């Protein structure tokens, strides 16, 4: 069995058509997450208002500020590749946010169970964002968009941290408090 190095295989198989198609996919994904982040800026205040535990409220409030920065970073990423920042509806995020609204309406206000539901919804969103930014970072690197790749890498780390913080809030307090209600 013969193997070629990654670099050799990439150089030998890269065609202008394939690169153009990959760039189009990359831009579509970028527009998708741009829409998602803009809508998260609108949705996170509802989660903050619905939360009971102060630690959860603070965690989401901090992430709201980060999310606003993510929108700005995405605008910088668009600019760095010579594209206009244009959101395109993200069906996945739309579904996740709809589910979050349903969880809020199906749980009693002021309960730890609602906090568990908020953490669950928040982590689903974080996992979607982690997947999206990981993909964008890899595609940006492949396409030679190093500035955009660096922006996505920074956001990816923040999304991983947000997910970890939600886990800590759940494990350190909220889940046990919900069982005791």
Question: Which ranges hold each PLM region?
Answer:
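Amphipathic alpha-helical hairpins
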Residues: 1-181
């Amino acid at each position: 069995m013969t193997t070629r190095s990654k670099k050799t295989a990439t150089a030998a198989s890269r065609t202008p058509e394939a690169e153009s198609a990959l760039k189009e996919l990359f831009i579509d994904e970028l527009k998708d997450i741009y829409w998602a982040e803009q809508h998260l800026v609108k949705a996170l205040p509802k989660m903050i208002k619905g939360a009971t535990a102060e630690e959860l409220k603070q965690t989401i409030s901090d992430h709201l500020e980060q999310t606003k920065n993510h929108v700005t970073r995405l605008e910088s990423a668009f600019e760095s590749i010579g594209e206009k920042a244009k959101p395109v509806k993200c069906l996945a995020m739309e579904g996740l946010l709809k589910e979050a609204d349903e969880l809020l309406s199906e749980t009693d206000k002021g309960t730890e169970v609602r906090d568990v539901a908020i953490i669950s919804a928040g982590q689903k969103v974080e996992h979607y964002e982690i997947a999206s930014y990981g993909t964008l970072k890899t595609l940006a690197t492949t396409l030679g968009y190093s500035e955009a790749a660096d922006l996505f890498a920074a956001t990816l780390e923040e999304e991983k941290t947000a997910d970890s913080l939600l886990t800590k809030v759940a494990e350190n307090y909220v889940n046990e408090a919900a069982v005791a209600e």
